[in-house]
Amino acid sequence: MIKKIGVLTSGGDAPGMNAAVRGVVRTALSEGLEVYGVYDGYLGLYEGRIEKLDRSSVSDVINKGGTFLGSARFPEFKEVEVREQAIENLKKHGIDALVVIGGDGSYMGAKKLTEMGYPCIGLPGTIDNDIAGTDYTIGYLTALNTVIDAIDRLRDTSSSHQRISIVEIMGRHCGDLTLMSAIAGGCEYIITPETGLDKDKLIKNIQDGIAKGKKHAIIALTELMMDANELAREIEAATGRETRATVLGHIQRGGRPAAFDRVLASRMGNYAVHLLMEGHGGRCVGIVKEQLVHHDIIDAIENMKRPVRSDLYQVAEELF
């Protein structure tokens, strides 16, 4: 029977992580369990930075961005000896199970701990929305609002200067954030891992728009597709129209979480505790068609694929 639960946040921070931690802590305490916070993710787990949490520990955090527990990249966690030390640190506090909030790298750590016999539940905390088995990840919709706000501001100045603007948006190998931002922000062109980049077609479309009297354009580009500044130089050389790239960077991860992310994170944190109490381990939580679900964490990492939103790409194609 579970008596003590640990919780950590790992990888890139996402708005709503604090709400998720709060959901875990308050639910566990309501069920008569003890809760321990692990500071700075798997690094802190390895170094033994673990402290008992109470209700006041998570007071006034639901509205704050980032994660008060801290987070850190710690690739050394893939080493067996490192994980053995981490488990030993959990056992020192009598912690029976762990809730891990983060992206696919964090899930991999939870998977490894599960394989070593330590029950873990994963919660999807990443602005990239690239986790299989869930329609939305914690932080995604807040980041979407942040990106749209930036696009709106860029459109103002691009229009004033008759300029083409490229907006580089986070997402790694998933174009969801770029796609939704482009639709909501009224972008003229979109480049994501799912669409690829036909540079000749892009330049021709821009030239056609200029010929029809279009004064400015916004291009939404997913990070890692190509160098945004190099693309800007090529477009300017081909069209004669001033072109500038704006890399939004880590501003997309910050800020007060939107109401949706606060509620989603709270629900997921609550659900994770109940899963552990029911004897589940090695699972990850998602939301599908507004219903909370859980999957085998190994399947989420290795077998499940996020569906390409072909319907929304069709909408984007017709609107752009």
Curated annotation (Swiss-Prot):
Q: Where is the active site?
A: 128
Top-level taxon:
Bacteria
Q: What keywords is this UniProt entry annotated with? A: Allosteric enzyme, ATP-binding, Cytoplasm, Glycolysis, Kinase, Magnesium, Metal-binding, Nucleotide-binding, Transferase
Annotated catalysed reactions: beta-D-fructose 6-phosphate + ATP = beta-D-fructose 1,6-bisphosphate + ADP + H(+)
| CDD domains for this protein | Bacterial_PFK
Keyword Kinase on entry: yes
Task: Name its pathway.
Answer: Carbohydrate degradation; glycolysis; D-glyceraldehyde 3-phosphate and glycerone phosphate from D-glucose: step 3/4
Which Pfam families does this one have?
PFK
**GO BP, sorted A to Z:** canonical glycolysis; fructose 1,6-bisphosphate metabolic process; fructose 6-phosphate metabolic process
Chain sites annotated for binding ATP: 12, 73-74, 103-106
UniProt activity-regulation remark: Allosterically activated by ADP and other diphosphonucleosides, and allosterically inhibited by phosphoenolpyruvate.
Which Enzyme Commission number(s) are on file for it?
2.7.1.11
Per UniProt, Mg(2+) binds at 104
Question: What GO terms are given for molecular function?
Answer: 6-phosphofructokinase activity; AMP binding; ATP binding; fructose-6-phosphate binding; identical protein binding; metal ion binding; monosaccharide binding
Q: Where does the record say this protein resides?
A: Cytoplasm
One GO CC annotation = 6-phosphofructokinase complex
Q: Which family does it belong to?
A: Belongs to the phosphofructokinase type A (PFKA) family. ATP-dependent PFK group I subfamily. Prokaryotic clade 'B1' sub-subfamily.
**Assembly description:** Homotetramer.
Q: What does this protein do?
A: Catalyzes the phosphorylation of D-fructose 6-phosphate to fructose 1,6-bisphosphate by ATP, the first committing step of glycolysis.
Query: Which NCBIfam families does the UniProt record give?
Result: PFKA_ATP, PRK03202.1
What protein does this entry describe? ATP-dependent 6-phosphofructokinase
- Native organism is Vibrio campbellii (strain ATCC BAA-1116)
Q: Which gene encodes it?
A: pfkA
